């Protein structure tokens, strides 16, 4: 048995024998099981059952489904932006950083969002939709793309803040941890988008609490913005890997490490 297999077996044992009630802990462990490469049977055993826990206004499954939807939208937008960059269709006039640096930032964020999506769906999260509509201008103008990214990541960070709060209320410490880890990354994306526009990267001492009641508030916002209308299809992991591997520095990781919690 390899070292990875030994570690996975040990983690699997911990997941299945925690002092917490088995049912509640497995809800919280589902993402860990999938994200760390544990055998599919264990991930399946840790699947969410769709029940609402005391103190939570939404089910864990609902929250994770919303998160997967947001990540799918982000991957779709960034993948198509990368395609446009490769084809020389993006006007970069007015950006405050060198173009190669901006390209590396876009590639890194694409990698991270796909990693988030894989992590969530590997544990059973199901996106509400997988086809999205974005303002056409973001695929041809770097400044407009950065403005859109800044806004979108503010919504993402706030949604993960709400998820963190709900999971904490439900006693799901692991899911609260993962929500924080992903949400913190989304906030760095917002800062990078602002820096590339020549703005103060982080202009707030605290992440905005946009959704004080439910994570579902993010769905309403994206619906109002028209993002959830059918349009561009989520490209899938293979296409994301291919565009990262076959262009720019030919690095499928895009320089990103710690690709699971």
Regions found by a protein language model. Give the residues of each.
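All-alpha RGS (Regulator of G-protein Signaling) helical domain and cognate RGS-like helical scaffolds
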Residues: 2-20, 27-261
